[in-house]
Amino acid sequence: MSKVITDVFYTAFKTALPLTSSPLVQCITNEITVESMANALLYIDAKPVMADDQREFPEFFAQSDALLLNLGHISEVRQQNLLAAGKFAQATNQPTVIDLVGVSATQLRYDLGHQLLANHPNVVKGNISEMRRFADLKSTGRGVDGSQLDQSATALGELAASLQQLTQAFPTTTFLATGKIDLVVSAKGTWYLKNGVPQLDRFTGTGDIVGALIAALLGTGLDNDAAVVVAVSYFNCCGEVAAAQNRTGGLAAFREGTLNQLSLLAATADWLQMVKGEAL
């Protein structure tokens, strides 16, 4: 029998947001969405630093509370920086999120993702198609976008089973696959999250922002599963509010509204009533 997601993570939903501290999140990411990610962190009262030079790692790791590694724009130098940061994070017990952007598109990203997984990060995320490829299932994704064909009930169940298999080798890692229904899998269980609106797929960086939000919550000491569930639900609810307030506007206005809600919605006592999801 399924359980309502807010019952399972009641304490986290009640206390995680608004933040009571300002975790410093080190982001090694892509140039396309770096500004959106930095501002999203600031909007929830976290602090971003976008430092990807290995020479600075010892000093920045000593200051930061969490690490986000995003594969959105790969070069030979950035690949080496991502690998070095992953190892540094493991050695210093830094909470880490790996965002597998484009892993379904190229073998290089697939291999890099698995190299980073070997460091036992806290969270590994991607869209449904990316996570299917990562789990060695057939994926119909193109570029960095997920495919509707990968989001059927059968495909989602197949992915959940494959990710559960991965948790046997990586029991301290939580896996997130985002889509129309978001799938969260860890050694502790499987959860479906059901908030969001289609417009969130229509502007770039939404998945990157979710990764940053997860890292921020990990930086406050929240456990992996709770950080993922709360961050995904919160961002999707921000999108729902923005869509409701922007019925006649365009996508640019919707984007602005969603980002605005990051700094507003947590102060609304009834936002938890919006959350939809279940534990399987």
Swiss-Prot record:
Into which EC class is this enzyme placed? transferase
Q: What is its EC number?
A: 2.7.1.50
Q: Does the keyword DNA damage apply?
A: no
The record's GO molecular-function terms, alphabetically, read: ATP binding; hydroxyethylthiazole kinase activity; magnesium ion binding
Its lineage reads: Bacteria, Bacillati, Bacillota, Bacilli, Lactobacillales
Originating species: Lacticaseibacillus casei (strain BL23) (Lactobacillus casei)
The name under which this protein is listed is: Hydroxyethylthiazole kinase
Family, per entry? Belongs to the Thz kinase family.
What does this protein do, in the record's words?
Catalyzes the phosphorylation of the hydroxyl group of 4-methyl-5-beta-hydroxyethylthiazole (THZ).
Q: Which cofactor does it need?
A: Mg(2+)
